[in-house]
């Protein structure tokens, strides 16, 4: 998977570079849920060809691989898959989803498709359950990962305190943002399981702007519409979610 995407000079996410690796990866994940006949119906690819792909005897190439990847993502009901694994019924425990490597591969592919062609130079998980997904993406597209922590972080980087008040009142809380040195002109993709606290997020956006870092994209697995409206996401920034609550 780590070799499936090459880092371009523009730092945009490039789905055309060896997409066969992740397409086959997804086929193998889906094979655990469907038989070859069902997969053939979904993809329009003969069973014999699917067998060769999944067993590693051959692999789709170039534009064919990219078309296959898009076809797979269009035919996977991610919202239903997440609901099924997390028992979503208005309240949800996402640990079963975000710690499942097979589901992470599908969500990761979905994110790469959503933000394909956009300048992304770093990945920033906003909650603890989104760290595995952020790590997967960071490895997949060879981008550094920022960290946001409720505890001070000591590392070879630049740690910035973020002071905010939940719901704009009460006692002040502090988080720490760990970014790389020489981060000016970075464009960050934030990853979260649910919509982050608006006060924390809006303060984070201010801190990023002060350090000449752009918000390149916003992704959350589950979006609560009321909280989403309170986020000060800059105009033109792509936002993406799987389930709207």
Feature locations, PLM:
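Active-site-facing substrate-recognition patch
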Residues: 10-33, 37-38, 52-119
């Amino acid at each position: 998977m780590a070799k499936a995407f090459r880092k371009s000079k523009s730092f945009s996410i490039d789905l055309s570079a060896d997409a066969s690796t992740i397409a086959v990866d997804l086929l193998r994940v889906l094979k655990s849920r469907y038989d070859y006949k069902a997969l053939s119906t979904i993809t329009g690819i003969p069973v014999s060809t699917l067998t060769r792909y999944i067993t590693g005897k051959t692999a789709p190439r170039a534009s064919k691989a990219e078309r296959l990847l898009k076809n797979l993502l269009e035919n996977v009901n991610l919202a239903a898959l997440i609901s099924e694994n997390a028992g979503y019924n208005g309240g949800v425990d996402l640990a079963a989803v975000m710690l499942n490597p097979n589901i992470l591969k599908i969500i990761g592919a979905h994110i790469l498709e959503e933000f394909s062609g956009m300048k992304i130079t770093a990945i920033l998980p906003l909650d603890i359950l989104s760290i595995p997904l952020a790590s997967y993406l960071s490895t997949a597209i060879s981008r550094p990962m920022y960290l946001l922590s409720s505890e001070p972080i000591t590392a070879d980087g630049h740690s910035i305190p973020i002071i905010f008040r939940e719901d704009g009142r009460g006692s002040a809380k502090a988080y720490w943002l760990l970014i790389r040195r020489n981060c000016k002109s970075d464009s960050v993709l934030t990853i979260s399981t649910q919509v982050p606290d608006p006060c924390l997020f809006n303060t984070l956006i201010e801190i990023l702007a002060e350090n000449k870092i752009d918000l390149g994209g916003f992704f959350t697995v589950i979006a609560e519409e009321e909280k989403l409206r309170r986020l000060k996401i800059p105009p033109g920034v792509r936002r993406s979610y799987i389930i709207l609550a």
